[in-house]
């Protein structure tokens, strides 16, 4: 247990669980890591980490390659599938994402938000989709909302207090490749998103990649998630980028809103 948390009136925390989560996060972030690398990165002794790894291996949470590198184990596959499949947004939204990918011929995403980051629940590839490491990173690594069109569309419609809290946590110019230079510049973008109903990412994160995102909203200020379309700049330009695709993205988001409301 964490005695300091108890003394401060906070819920008690089991330190061993927190340590295990740190180890799992490190393996995920590095896409494989050695015992020595874990010892360098974490504030734990080599012997302690070795004990954790032996336990995690025993239950299938981690696996060890022949060269000694630890990877996440197959234990996560059914667990993550269950977590995703049990959400109403995934169950009621994926059909519309498939339709959107067919209509636009590009890659469509269904995302939700957790702790100020976007999580990809579902991805559908259109006939002109280009599979890239970018899409893989989107699925595997939750990113701060301001770094993508889908994320900005969520951020724009969050309650003002929470939106301002998330903006205050951004280290502008250091933690992402987006060219948004200041909190005020981001606020101006988000005001435009609220006015037009959708957000764009015009090569802000990846050179040559454009995307359009629209929020999935409820009756109140709640934002369930967002819909987005992503494509190479040469395949998403002019009339498509200015009106046709945004209209389809907003339509898909609205249909999912209706399905969530009437489920």
Swiss-Prot record:
Keyword list, A-Z: Arginine metabolism, DNA-binding, Plasmid, Transcription, Transcription regulation
GO BP terms, alphabetized: arginine metabolic process; negative regulation of DNA-templated transcription
Described function: Probably regulates transcription of the arcABC operon.
Protein name, entry field: Probable HTH-type transcriptional regulator ArcR
Domain IclR-ED: from-to ranges: 89-262
GO molecular function, one term: DNA-binding transcription factor activity
Expression induction: No induction in fermentatively grown cells.
Top-rank taxon, per record: Archaea
Gene3D superfamilies hit by this protein: 3.30.450.40, Winged helix-like DNA-binding domain superfamily/Winged helix DNA-binding domain
PROSITE patterns referenced in this protein's UniProt entry, alphabetically: HTH_ICLR, ICLR_ED
Organism of derivation: Halobacterium salinarum (strain ATCC 29341 / DSM 671 / R1)
DNA-binding residue intervals: 35-54
InterPro entries listed in its UniProt record: GAF-like_dom_sf, HTH_MetabolicPath_Reg, Tscrpt_reg_IclR_C, Tscrpt_reg_IclR_N, WH-like_DNA-bd_sf, WH_DNA-bd_sf
Family annotation (Pfam families): HTH_IclR, IclR_C
Residues of the HTH iclR-type domain: 14-74
SMART domains, sorted: HTH_ICLR
